[in-house]
Structures are given as C-alpha cells and as structure tokens.
Amino acid sequence: MTVARNRAGAGPGKGSPISSFADKTFTDPARIRNFCIIAHIDHGKSTLADRMLQLTGVVEERQMRAQYLDRMDIERERGITIKAQNVRLPWKVGDDEFVIHLIDTPGHVDFTYEVSRALEACEGAVLLVDAAQGIEAQTLANLYLAMEKDLTIIPVLNKIDLPAADPDRYAEEIAHITGCEPGDVLRVSGKTGMGVKELLDEVVRQVPAPVGDPDGPARAMIFDSVYDAYRGVVTYVRVVDGRISPREKITMMSTGATHDLIEVGIISPEPKASIGLGVGEVGYLITGVKDVRQSRVGDTVTAARGGATEPLVGYRDPKPMVYSGLYPLDGSDYPVLRDALDKLRLNDAALAYEPETSVALGFGFRCGFLGLLHMEITRDRLEREFGLELISTSPNVVYRVVMEDGAEHVVTNPSYWPEGKIREVYEPMVKCTVIAPSEFIGAIMELCQNRRGELGGMDYLSETRVELRYEMPMGEIMFDFFDALKSRTKGYASLDYEEAGEQQADLVKVDILLQGEAVDAFSSIVHRSAAGAYGGRMTSKLRELIPRQQFEVPIQAAIGSKIISRENIRAIRKDVLAKCYGGDISRKRKLLEKQKEGKKRMKTIGRVEVPQEAFVAALSSESVGDKPKK
C-alpha cells in the first residue's frame, strides 16, 4: 500500500520533507487518531516507531536512522527514550485518508510524569510487549495509568521474529491482565516490519476519534516543551477545543502570562509551519519566550481575547523525590554549572536546584530529581553538553524531623539535620512492584526484608511469573536495590515504584570525622540498625583513599557524640638519623626527641587536606552501592 504523496509543494530534495495530505491542518476530527506506545525499556518501542515512519512515507529511506525520534545523543547511546516525542503520520485505509498522531513516551519509572502527560494527549494506547520477555513491572504501571484515563488499549507482541520468542505464552499473560482474548493480541516485528501495517489499520479501527467543541474558546494542553537555541521555547500541545492560529495572543492559564504566537506547526517528523491547529490535532507553538518555566507541562493554553475560563484538568508540578549535591571539580566552573543547570531546566521541568556550599567541596548546587536514572542522566548531560567535571554527593530522600518542642524540619541534606532532642523522624515510603520468574521468589523476599520492606501481596501472572508487591522506605531502594535485585534474579526481575506517603522510623545521622572534625560531604542519614555497617565501610574506605601525613590521622564515624567506628592512617616517618653515620647515641636520641615534639605540635595544628580524587572515589563508589568484596 502506498501513501498518496502530494509532490506539488516541496519536492523531496536534499533534506526537504515529503509532503502528504497530513500536512494540511484543521483536519476533520473524525479522521484523526491520537495514540501512544506503552512499553518497557528495550521492548522495541522506538524501532516500531521507525517502521511506522517508513511505512507511512514521512521519512525517506536514505534519511532514515535508527531511533529516529530519539533526538538526544544520550538517548541513542543508552537506547532509552527520555523526552516524549510526537509525530504526525498520513495513513489510508481503502480510500479513506486518516491523520495519525503518534506520541512516543519514555519507559523508565523515573519518567512516569512524562508518560502521564503524553497519555493526556491520546485516546488510545498500544501496549507493546517483548514476545521473548513478557510484560514488565513498569509497563504494568503505565498500563494502569492508561486504563485510569479510559484509553483504548491495543495489545501487541513485538519481536516475534526472535528465535526465543514465545508469543502464545505471553499472549495468554496479556489477555489475563487486559481482559481480552489471546487471539486479539496482535503480533508484529518492529525490526522486519511484519504486522506493522495491520497494527496501523487497527489503530484507525479501534482508537476513538477526538471530541471537542470546534467553535468554543481555544483550549490546548501542553504535554511537552523543549528549548531551541535559536527559536526559544518550543511548546508541544494537543488542541482540545476551538482553534489556535499564528499571530494571535495566547495565555497560559496556570501563570496568567500572555505571549504572541510567532509560529504554529506540526511535526512530521521534522517541524513544519502550518496555518493553525484544530480540535484533536497535535503540534507545536513558538512564542519566542526563552524560559521553559513559562510553558509548564500539563498547563492549558487559551486565546488571550475571549479565551476559556476553565483550564483542562491534569496539571501538577512534578515533585523531586531524590536530592543530591552537584559540585564542579574546579571551583572556577561554578558560574558555568549555574548556566548549564538553567539551560537544562529549560528542557526539564522536573529538575529543581538551589545553591549550597560545602566546607569540603566549595560552591555547588543541591539538586532535586525524580529518581536515580533522572539524576544520572542529568549529570551525564551536564558533563557531555557543557564539558563540566562534577562531583555528586550520595543521593538522599526528603525526611521530616519533629523536635521535642514540636518544631518541624524538612531535611533534604544531611548537613541540615537539626541539633538537639528529636522526638520523631518520618521518611518517605514507596509501593514497589516486582515481576520475576517464580523460582526467584525466595531471593526477592529475602532482599526486600533486608531493606525493611513489608509484603503487601503476591499474584501469579502465569504459572512461571509472579508479581510481588512491597511497601518499602524510599531511602532503601535509592542506592543499589535495583542492581541487587537484578543480580539475585539473573537479570529477569523488573521493578516499578510509586509514592506511598511516609512512616515513622528510627533514623540517625552518621558523621565522618577526620581528626575530630566532621566532613559534611560524607555525612549520611541511615537507619540505626545499619549505622555501624555504614560507618565501618566509610572509615575503611577513606583510610585507603586519604594520603598518609607526617602525623597519625584518626578517621571516625559518629552518631552525635558517640563514636561507632574508627580507623587510623599511620604517620609517615622521616628518617632523621640518616645524616648520623655513627657517633654518640645521645645525639641520635636528641634528634628523635625533637622529631617527636614536632609531630606532637603538628598533630594539634596540622590540617588534613582531603584530595579531590578521594572525594570522588568515596562518593561515587558509595552512590552506586558497595558490592560485597570478593
């Protein structure tokens, strides 16, 4: 089947987009279909999107590249999707022409907010499952999000060309979860393109057309915004009511800010300016604004004159769950780091940061992230896109501390831990869902119990796969829980988590003292039962990392004034007797006494300089979790 291509306009010259009937906007809503793909990392979502781009003819063969919609280098390198992307595709069923908007969403748990926003812009979702691996925990979480929003679900098994594929078994599993028949599950291969045409036909058949009032006041929901160095903020919207045209004034309903619309257009899959957008259409707006916070994701855009009074539901500020300090290795890079964070914030509304100083590390920023992957990717982007060298302190969650006198403190950094009598401490909890082969139940239960988890329930998805639900403190899954889970289940387990309030816990702050002085960068908040292990681990690690001095240096771990662990760095001894070739013993004794006095004085006034490498090594190995020593 070929797509009608109107070549009267732009000819398919070098880099020029192929024009088709989908390039005309104000399409009749009955001929529009909006859908997204829900899938776990590595289940072939971006590859399937690539095949759709080729099949509908919007990308020429010679311009095709793998993961076409993943724009960032880091997305392509890690093979993951971070930002939600969208594309407008032409499709014909018989003689009927349809416009399909595909919104490509991230699959990782940290980016659930990006997924929920993309779902708001759709009426249907393709549930994509790897035919060799089956459904994963995060896919399940995103599927439930889609079901809550009443989207039409089209179940699909991908990678059926793999020798290890077992489509019949996993079709049963999907049918069990979605309530459809195993025969209704479509089978495709994103790699070979098999079954993709049938999938697009099903999207047209099953996904409902968008509904909205074409004559009402304009209302459009922002589901993403990116920063372009030349054009300012590019805002991606889905029009719900009315129409949006260039050269008119628009208002953002959450902030009340008014902007001039410079350009309105569609993505197919490169941006193309258009005469406007109508009901159900997905496209982009450019207002020339330079700050992405002006166009918040989930906000409602309306006309400045005669606009809507009621915003669309669905906007909430993303809340950081994990905090970590970011410091430049070279102190003079601080302004560069500040500018870099400002620029990243333009693309990433979920990133929060404020300046902070550390005695040990100098000037830096306390940054809030959605999760550990978000933190790692932000750091990667800072280093790669802005050429910075950074130290990040070990991540921690937000604690609420209540003092004896009833005063409350919110602690995002161990150095803000209040002094004095503490009545109670509350820590954030998460509900974890682990899906794994049933032979690993014992290993998973043991791991979760060691991390202070409570079993909430257990379901068999099929005879061989089981879903375990745990409630755990978020601080316990922060470091290496995912690594430990993967190693205990030979890589077969998948994990998803969501917030679940807070609980009271017996938490303490462990300080690391060098020569009696606390080093703020190494402080950590841990459960009392794990404090001894943390203290012992850090002191022995620092003993190896800090260079020896002319005097003995004690490294101690302490809770308040109580020392729980100690290691000593032996002094370097200079051979003061080297110049005495023989001679009187009293002469030697005098030199040794003098050395002893000098060492004593040095010990009282000497300072221990901790080299940057020691900080980097201690903090980085700490944050990835300590592997048991072989």
Swiss-Prot record:
Database matches in SUPFAM superfamilies: EF-G C-terminal domain-like, P-loop containing nucleoside triphosphate hydrolases, Translation proteins
Enzyme class: hydrolase
Gene3D superfamilies, sorted: 3.30.70.240, Elongation factor 4, C-terminal domain, Elongation Factor G (Translational Gtpase), domain 3, P-loop containing nucleotide triphosphate hydrolases, Translation factors
One Pfam family linked to the record: GTP_EFTU_D2
Entry's Gene Ontology cellular component terms: plasma membrane
GO molecular function per UniProt: GTP binding; GTPase activity; ribosome binding; translation elongation factor activity
Protein name: Elongation factor 4
Organism of derivation: Rhodococcus opacus (strain B4)
Chain's gene name: lepA
